[in-house]
Amino acid sequence: MFVLLALGGLGAGCYPTPNHMPVILKGPRPLGSPSTPGGLKFEEGTEIQLQLEVKDQDNDEVFFRWSQVPAEPAGAFSSTTVATPTWTVPSPPEDPNTPIYLYVEVEDGNDGILIGQSPAIFVIPK
């Protein structure tokens, strides 16, 4: 009987603690931009500070990967691997009614992956 209890006690410690996915608390969106229906409008060439606030319940290190859709015309991120890069607005798409979306993939290194999407961004020509 004692052996079974000892083995049961050892076995209980073998199960890893479940990982919690990161959670986006704010963003991704241009810092200070109002919540407006239909999207946000920025003049081409404007440098925008992006806002993103993330929490990981397990206090895992969090990694970021920013991208833009559609990829062309390409805006410029100051870095695609930090939480709050700047992004320079590209020239307008051929169809001025085509929105641009910024995406951020947030990963905690323990298979917790989350993707955030900005509001629609429309480019105003200079």
Role assignments for model-derived ranges:
Residues G38-T46:
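Short, solvent-exposed loop/linker segments at the N-terminal edge
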Residues G32-G38, Q68-T84:
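Low-complexity "stalk/linker" and mucin-like segments enriched in Ser/Thr/Pro/Ala/Gly
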Residues E53-D58, V106-D108:
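Extracellular acidic, Ser/Thr/Pro-rich low-complexity tracts
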Residues D60-R65:
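Solvent-exposed loop segments of extracellular immunoglobulin-like
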Residues N19-V23, P28-L31, P85:
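Proline-centered linker/hinge motifs at extracellular inter-domain junctions
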Residues I48, P96-L102:
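Exposed beta-strand face motif in extracellular beta-rich ectodomains
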Residues V82-P96:
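Solvent-exposed segments in extracellular or luminal domains encompassing
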Residues G45-V54:
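A short beta-strand segment in extracellular, disulfide-stabilized domains
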